[in-house]
Amino acid sequence: MLLINGSVLGAMVDLIHAIAEFLNLFFAGVLAGEELVICYGVRTVVTVLDQRPQIELRHALIRKLRALEPAIFILTALSGLAAMSLDGTGAGFRLRCFATLCLLIWVVITLFGTIPIKKDTLAWRPDAPPTDWKVLLRRWERFDIARCWAAVISFAFLVAAVGMG
């Protein structure tokens, strides 16, 4: 009953592949959307605040997002690996590889760019930040823009890969 000319097994593999692709697109889209909203929505609004409320808001955002972003990334990466392994070297394989590369760029920027700055930022006193706090924030924002576009381009490659399949 498990194998009727291979069609039941083949249908199950196809279903699992479709679910993996859906989950991968979903989580990659959530990651890209979250990055876009933070980068071009929240960040631009935060900068108009005075020093104390700006730093307090940044502290709150860092604390909230430091659990959410890794969870979204892990789900994106795991579903991507599943979809890629089930897809094999099909039509969208190269695009999935480019998407994975963009996701790796996102990770490198996060680990070596934004996380150290966020860690330092949490130590700032809102009423007495370091004298160069605005310079540090501009550096953080450059990393944030690069991260955002790495996530968005990764998502675009995944959409194209699914479209080719």
Region locations from a protein language model:
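Core segments of transmembrane alpha-helices
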Residues: 70-83, 147-156
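Mid-bilayer segments of alpha-helical transmembrane spans in multi-pass integral membrane proteins
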Residues: 104-112
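Interfacial loop at the N-terminal end of multi-pass membrane proteins
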Residues: 17-22, 28-75, 122-137
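Membrane-proximal soluble regions of multi-pass membrane proteins
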Residues: 134-142, 147
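Short, strongly hydrophobic alpha-helical membrane anchors
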Residues: 1-18
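Interfacial segments of alpha-helical transmembrane regions
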Residues: 14-29, 89-104
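Juxtamembrane boundary at the C-terminal end of a transmembrane helix
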Residues: 159-165
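Membrane-helix exit/interface motif
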Residues: 40-41, 73, 77-90, 113
